[in-house]
Amino acid sequence: MAVVVSIDAGTTGVRSFALDETGQQLALSYQEFTQHYPNPGWVEHDPTEIWNAVKFTLSELNDRINEPIAAIGITNQRETVVAWDRKTGEPLCNAIVWQDLRTSDRCEQLLELGHLDQIRQTTGLLLNPYFTATKIEWLLHNNVVENNSNLAFGTIDSWLLWKLTDGSSYATDVSNASRTLLYDIKENHWSSEICELFGIPESALPEVLPSSGRFGTTSATTAIGAGIPVSGIAGDQQSALFGQACLEPGMTKNTYGTGSFVLMNAGSECPDPAEGLLTTVAWDLGNGPTYALEGSIFVTGAAIQWLRDGLGVISHASEISDLAASVPDNGGVFFVPAFAGLGSPWWDTRARGTIIGITGGTQRGHLARAVVEAIAFQTRDVVEAMSRAAGTPIGEMRVDGGASVMDLLLQIQANQLGVRVARPIITETTAQGAAMLAGLAEGVWSETGEIHSAWRLDKAFDPQSDRKAYDTEHERWLQALDRSRFWVD
């Protein structure tokens, strides 16, 4: 039996995942790591703690499967940047996380200086603190790291690849590179002009390789043993698109995680920039890039965590579905979870969270339902922008991620979108996608048709009939969203 392992280094923890050649999950191990908030709007991770979580989960997984491992894939939270010393292999500071807002003013300055069009046309992205470039610039400008020949920057995948191979491989894949704000997605290389704009030396950036192919082999110091090929890498959302078998243009998925990320396969031609959306590289199987349109929603699952940890409305995240279903509607309450501003399609870093419509009759259930509905409303906003850009509505949305277990959410989502929402049997599609990219490179699967065959439906949610009522709810949501915008000076 061929076994492929995937390391999924997310925003709040690491999952290591094993599957066989039929695409069936064999084992899963998970380890959380600490979130650091040193200043308002700042979010950091300890790279060593992430690496230790990887070692722990790989060791636990290895004990469970007792089979030789054919390949390893890596998928990761994107945009988050690690700086380390190539000589010692040690991090130079905490990683700056994708949610971090410390470079908001710098992004505003670059907008005022007229750099948006150059950035947009070259990278497919926007000037926003979400992306990696201004984080690296901040580290250099504030002398947190010293610019010398030993300096290495990388997204989480590069850091883990370095550690897995004991420093013999310093690389990333094209999907992660395309999220840095430094990569020319049409010419497929680091942009010298953009690197110069941010004062970032190209020598401190990793080699960019296809998403499926040999990146290196594990060293004897890893918890899983030496000589195992690391043969697939993709950013978490692109990996989920692949794991959902969205391999044809127009196929669309949404991952409900800390945030939610809607991606549509755009084919082999790089699409023009679309209002409110990002153009990104989905993957490269060795024959050139496949592109995607993306809508990035910053806060969805994190809002459920806030109900639990911030307000104490629920004790466990799993309670929210029953609590939201305990009331027939939201009671006029709308919640805009703009904790870190708004992402697609609004891109407003000055927006802040808003709860509106509270009365003396508002109950815990109404607040819970407003949180669940906010996930669906934000997704609808992105999908409508995506349909306008593509010139055609989507036909189906495939879903995954932690909140996809909530039938109530998926039914509300189908009602708001007016299309079928399909949940697969395996909802760990982020990890599954990276494993499949690695397995393709090592011959576990010989063609993408086998990836299609591995996707299996668990449950479909078709839209219910009251379209006018759903549109009215969405219009009220947009009114609430407007109240949240441009709050911070």
Describe the residue ranges of each PLM region.
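Glycine/Thr-rich phosphate-binding loops that ligate phosphate moieties of nucleotide
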Residues: 1-30, 37, 70-113, 169, ...
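Gly/Ser/Thr-rich active-site cleft segment
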Residues: 9-11, 22, 119-237, 292, ...
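N-terminal phosphate-binding loop and adjacent alpha-helix
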Residues: 29-67
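Gly-rich Lys/Arg/Thr-decorated short loops/hinges at beta-loop-alpha junctions or inter-strand turns
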Residues: 33-44, 118-121, 171-178, 359-366
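Phosphate/pyrophosphate-binding loops at sites that engage ATP/ADP/AMP, CoA/4′-phosphopantetheine
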Residues: 54-70, 142-148, 163, 192-202, ...
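Conserved glycosyltransferase catalytic-site signature
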Residues: 77, 133-136, 157-158, 234-239, ...
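A polyampholytic, Gly/Pro-enriched intrinsically disordered region
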Residues: 112-128, 226-233, 251-253, 440-454
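ATP-dependent carbohydrate kinase catalytic cores
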Residues: 175-288, 292, 298-302, 315-324, ...
